[in-house]
Amino acid sequence: MSGIVVGIDGSAGSERALEWAASEARTRKLPLTLVSAWHAPSAAMAAGMAWGGVNPGDVSGELRTYATKRLDAVCSEHADELAGVEVMQSVVQDSAAPALIDAAEGADLLVVGTRGHGGFAGLLLGSVSQHCVHHSPCPIVVVPPPTG
């Protein structure tokens, strides 16, 4: 996949990353792929099956639907920033870091946000952004969260 890949999780940090990635995609005339990962914890799935009240397929379907609606909402909320950019959406059943690394294969750039901490904690990246920095198959930009 060529173009720019950006991770979206609904956080302020990922929305800031989306704004940066959209601007970069427009400037470089590249397509932009928004990736939202969802993951059904196996313990929760097992508990549901053990209690007999939850069908794992139903849980997976609901999580996928929620992730898709969340990604659609982010696109709507950022319609101005995304104007003039070819946008694709990808909803992936996986943990965030592996989903982003897979999506970035063949991409020109991977863009991720990071959590917002000040002081000493601010020197540390979140686990997803840190994993991506070390394993991305393409150049990566880690966008800091909004200040204030």
Residue ranges, per PLM feature:
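Small/aliphatic-rich secondary-structure junction motif
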Residues: 2-54, 103
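Short glycine-/small-residue-rich Rossmann-like dinucleotide-binding loops
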Residues: 9, 75, 115
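Structural beta-alpha unit
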Residues: 13, 27, 76-110, 147-148
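General small-molecule cofactor/ligand-binding pocket signal
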Residues: 33-35, 88-92, 141
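A short acidic, glycine-rich active-site loop
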Residues: 53-70
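Glycine-rich, Arg-bearing micro-motifs that act as flexible, cationic patches
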Residues: 109-134, 145-148
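A short alpha->beta transition loop at the rim of the catalytic pocket in nucleotide-sugar-dependent
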Residues: 137
